[in-house]
Amino acid sequence: MTKNKGSQRGEIMKVALIASDNNASSGAFLSMTNLAIQLNQLHVKTIVIIPKEGPYVGPGDGVNLLRKHKIKYYVVPSISGVVSCDFPRNILATLGQIKYILRNKIYARGLAGILKKEHVDLVHINTVYSYFGAYAARKVNIPYVWHIREFLEEDQGNEFYFPKYMYKLMNRADLVIAISRSIYKKYNKSLHKNVMKVIYNGIDIDQFYKPERQIFEDSILKLCYVG
């Protein structure tokens, strides 16, 4: 991986986290927010880039989490490269998706300006739904890491419209992080093994460990299984 500019300047490193949604109940958004919190505690500065609107963006309440934890953020428009598996495959649809790629390249120019202004050393792309961060990182010669959290077809009924193009961008990343062995096994068929690594989501023990709470004391145990 390219040596970060912050360490070369003898300054604190700064990471830009590229979100694909703005949803306080989204697992991916929560994981990214927790990552920002942990990085800040380690004296690594962070900024978050959230999309303006779109089919996968959500209700727009993710910013409340960022404000609560005093995480600096920017709203930058972007368009996902992911579509539903039943999305039409015809000339008009393909032309529309090509138009979105061109628009994302324009949006990436604005993001590149933010990366330069903020003196960002590393770009972290939070899901496979967003890819314009890769354009911006390459434009200003900043290394980027890509987090894969989704199977897509198997768990969400979605897919890349241009899979080969998306895998090409992902293969150019300095690191691709799979959150499980199963995710790794799916994507390593299309991505270079030397850029992929399995890193499980961290758990804040203090958030879940409640020794003072008494459970399983009643004679009848009632369980609710959801999913």
Model-derived features with residue positions:
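Nucleotide-sugar donor phosphate/pyrophosphate-binding loop at the beta->alpha transition
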Residues: 106-107, 132, 143, 150-172, ...
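A short beta-strand/loop micro-motif in the catalytic core of glycosyltransferases
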Residues: 123, 172-181
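Conserved donor-binding/catalytic core segment of Leloir-type glycosyltransferases
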Residues: 15-18, 216-227
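Carbohydrate-associated surface elements
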Residues: 182, 202
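An aromatic- and histidine-rich active-site surface loop
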Residues: 56, 104, 108, 122-140
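Active-site proximal beta-strand in glycosyltransferases
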Residues: 15-16, 134-154, 177
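Glycine-rich phosphate-binding loop signature in dinucleotide/nucleotide-binding domains
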Residues: 114-120
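N-terminal strand-loop element at the rim of the active site
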Residues: 19-25, 38-98, 183
